[in-house]
């Protein structure tokens, strides 16, 4: 098997998260019209669900701050969709209460923090313990294992 680059792993992880969310929605709400964006660089959404813009982020939590995080250039997209889902991939080294959960976030309500990584990178964090971050689905062991194949977590 060919070794994937960091970018390829991130892409595969994102695709796995989108499939998990699609399957979850189909199970929990049969009959939804789900249309995936054809353009992988779509700056507005990952998919439309019954005409609503949906973004999916697939990542391990920043365990020491109990938050999900992304670069500041993603904030506009994460705030402008109708629904944001975060697929929480277990951290390679540290257990966390969010491991294996899919969270539904209310874009206009979730609070954020800013921080700088030990590598000097500015990041936006979404604290997990707030009313606008709602656990909606516990992934199966198979789904978690698929995500873990592509996990690329830096020490956080």
Where are these regions (language model features)?
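Nucleic-acid endonuclease domains
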Residues: 1-53, 57-156
